[in-house]
């Protein structure tokens, strides 16, 4: 069976427990990386100030075949992630649809995968992520790290599959998951 880790960068939001619980719903390993939050119970503590670099800090500790990512104020839909791996066993990256409270589904159906139409709702082969870590965006923006990784995989001709099922919920409302 294919194994998966979920890396959750956190700054200590109250919603962290909900994110961790959603990850434990399917992951073989869950790593919480606290960024500038020494008071937070976490597997790793860093002070990097950039979500992509915080995610990268977990790389040496991931022992699974695939790695997925979840922000500390979001949740994953467990069955969707596991089913996606079963349906696409040869993929290098699997992008799940993200339910965004303002934008609706992301990636938006019929739109190209470009900046603004890709979120962090993907999983990637761990060895490829280690070889192609997140690159920090322009200073003080922290935008585009997720798309930049997807773009590099597209440029490399990697096998990327798209799931139309919602697998990631951005800032869910109470009772939504």
Task: Mark where each language-model region is.
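Acidic donor-binding loop at a coil-to-helix junction in glycosyltransferase catalytic cores
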Residues: 141-149
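Acidic donor-binding/catalytic loop of UDP-sugar-dependent glycosyltransferases
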Residues: 74-87
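Short aromatic/hydrophobic "clamp" motif used to bind/position activated sugar donors
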Residues: 67
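A recurrent flexible, glycine/aromatic-enriched loop bordering the glycosyltransferase active site
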Residues: 105-124
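Short, well-formed alpha-helical segments that are part of the catalytic scaffolds
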Residues: 12-25
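Catalytic beta-strand/loop signature of glycosyltransferases that borders the donor
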Residues: 97, 160-167
